Amino acid sequence: MEVVGCKAKESSCTLRPAAMLFHGISGDHIQGIMEEMERRSKSESRLAKTVQMNGRETTMPSMSPEKPALCAGCGGKISDRYYLLAVDKQWHLRCLKCCECKLALESELTCFAKDGSIYCKEDYYRRFSVQRCARCHLGISASEMVMRARDSVYHLSCFTCTTCNKTLTTGDHFGMKDNLVYCRVHFETLIQGEYHPQLNYAELAAKGGGLALPYFNGTGTVQKGRPRKRKSPAMGIDIGSYSSGCNENDADHLDRDQQPYPPSQKTKRMRTSFKHHQLRTMKSYFAINHNPDAKDLKQLAQKTGLTKRVLQVWFQNARAKFRRNVLRQENGGVDKADGTSLPPPSSDSGALTPPSTATTLTDLTNPSITVVTSVTSSLDSHESGSPPQTTLTNLF
């Protein structure tokens, strides 16, 4: 876009100096002076036909009065001294505007043309940009922040769950199906085919097993969690597929190996096993404090890798077992005074729990479910009138 027109009429004039100005000068000298003046006059007229624009010289063609130029914007004749040349057409300074926002482009550095229409930079990128938002299908400018998922690009405000319209930010888990974005909860329910509008994540976790679902972490890559083991349902024993060494933040997606149970079949309870270093850490702290608070549980969770819920259950059962041991010792002293004796309590967990009775720990992701099942010990016969106690296998 250039200012290239100047309607300055070039007129040449012949200088006829008065004779008295050259009185006393020979004819040859007078002729030489007149030729020099004509040469300088022509040089000045040529310089008047150029203007300096953006560091470069642009020649301004003179318009003949017989064929005046027409403005491509309004269609009228251009009688101004300066005019604009864009897309090989002449424009009045006031007529070169964006066809969308009507922004005057006479002072702009660039303008864009498409199908005979003039656009400013913003409207051109908005309408004809190569990158388009996969949600609103509008153009994305080169300076705008975007969210990427697989091969799709989204505005920050358009990167939302298709079901609940929740805005997803960096670090949130989401899933994609048929080029549609879903949050973690609705993507899982969509895969399972059990979507209900009022279903929340707590109810979903209470259902038990699910399918292996891929979740994305906002960087376009799929990250897998720690695989979980399972035993055959035909064996008739509890499934030890819950790894207590993982917390909720270890995996970027929820990986479950167990298929959903039929509606008529009850979900089997989960079972927890502890590693040696986890037991050592919990036993060491239990010797100092039997009832840790929330701050202590948080520190223990960081050291052991267990969740607070698992630690709460372990300390609850440890306190119950400690009270039973103290009670048995007191009852043992009374029996000795009467001439009877009881076998001393053993630290082995096998003496407290019959081998034929299995102690299970239910799904810890749902606090509403009973955590520890009741187990009757062979020592309960010595405690007349006492209700069945709860315990956890391999506590110490």
Swiss-Prot record:
DNA-binding region: 267-326
GO molecular function: DNA-binding transcription factor activity, RNA polymerase II-specific; metal ion binding; RNA polymerase II transcription regulatory region sequence-specific DNA binding
Residue ranges with Low complexity bias: 352-365
Entry annotated with the keyword Membrane: no
Biological process terms in GO annotation: dorsal spinal cord interneuron anterior axon guidance; negative regulation of DNA-templated transcription; neuron differentiation; neuron fate specification; regulation of transcription by RNA polymerase II; thalamus development
Gene3D superfamilies documented for this protein: Cysteine Rich Protein, Homeodomain-like
Ranges annotated as biased composition (Polar residues): 384-396
Any Pfam family matching the protein: Homeodomain
SMART domains the record matches: HOX (SM00389), LIM (SM00132)
Alphabetized InterPro entries for the sequence: HD, Homeobox_CS, Homeodomain-like_sf, LIM_Homeobox_TF, Znf_LIM
GO cellular component, one term: nucleus
Keywords of this entry: DNA-binding, Homeobox, LIM domain, Metal-binding, Nucleus, Repeat, Zinc
PROSITE patterns: HOMEOBOX_1, HOMEOBOX_2, LIM_DOMAIN_1, LIM_DOMAIN_2
Domain LIM zinc-binding: 69-130, 131-193
Region feature (Disordered): 248-272, 328-365, 377-396
Record bears the keyword Nucleus: yes
Subcellular location: Nucleus
The protein's role, per its UniProt record: May be involved in gonadal development.
Name of the protein described by the UniProt record: LIM/homeobox protein Lhx9
Organism: Danio rerio
